[in-house]
Amino acid sequence: MLLAPGDVIKRSSEELKQRQIQINLVDWTESEGGKEDKTEPKEESKAEGSKDGEGTQSESGQKEEGGKETKDADVDRRIHTAVGSGSSTKGPGERANENADRGDGKVGGGGGDADAGVGATGTNGRRWVVLTEEIARAIESKYGTKIDVYRDEVPAQIIEVERSLQKELGISREGVAEQTERLRDLRRKEKNGTHAKAVERGGRKQRKESHGDAQREGVEEEKTSEEPARIGITIEGVMSQKKLLSMIGGVERKMAPIGARESAVMLVSNSIKDVMRATAYFTAPTGDPHWKEVAREASKKKNILAYTSTGGDAKTEFLRLFDHL
């Protein structure tokens, strides 16, 4: 039996269910009136875990992260910028986003070869990129698709991972903050015209090509209006896994369930009542207000294995324990 902080257990609940490991979680909720924290023990079995665990994880995650996220990370925000172009320009990225909001999941030009697992191609053959290394690693790990990180190149098509998808991918608070900072930098550069020269340089050739295509298709005005978005920077907000996969290609990796018998751990808990029967405990920076006391009691036990986070992603380090125990 392994003890761990409550928030680490919540973030890892899906993987624990796949391994058929039971969870005994003492949760805490803060009332709006500033009342004392309440605890509510919940034991998730194999059958019940798939319903209760996910709902609790989502609700608690929103409370923990909601207070520290800035307006730049709002779920409802959509940014579609064409650097060097007018604000009234409407490019293909906006129409793709509107379709996604209606629930059809269609994104213009967002194909990519799902089987290849190495590409993320957007409109006009350009590749979608993300803003941080952590997001790129999470996408590759979950969907098997390698995706590049934005390196200040122009033009570019950037995926902004929004709040609900951040949780799906297991992005840390530090990763969320890094993405927000890079978005601010992009806006600052756009305002100062940093990319304008590079955009203007490619504009003449693009306009000439677009004009020829428009004559052949009989839609010259539409081609001309879309052209600035193709030569600038487009930032596409993505909330759902379905939309992300339609943009980058790839499929969610379905791991075969790992039976509890393949791991020495049968149960994980953050309850102080389970200290006496615990054989190991894992500690990491946490928002679980009860964990400090649990860890203190666990450390008093003889012959208990103690594991401590090295400062990386606590969820990743926590799950690695099951491969070694």
Swiss-Prot record:
GO cellular component assignments: viral inner capsid
Residue numbers binding ATP: K106
Compartment(s) of residence: Virion
Compositionally biased spans, kind Basic and acidic residues: 8-18, 32-54, 61-79, 92-105, 175-229
Catalytic activity: ATP + H2O = ADP + phosphate + H(+)
Pfam family, one: Orbi_VP6
GO molecular function terms attached to this record: ATP binding; hydrolase activity; structural molecule activity
EC number: 3.6.4.13
Family under the similarity heading: Belongs to the orbivirus VP6 family.
Protein name (Swiss-Prot/TrEMBL): Helicase VP6-A
Organism of provenance: Bluetongue virus 11 (isolate USA) (BTV 11)
Lineage, top ranks: Viruses, Riboviria, Orthornavirae, Duplornaviricota, Resentoviricetes
Gene name, Swiss-Prot/TrEMBL: Segment-9
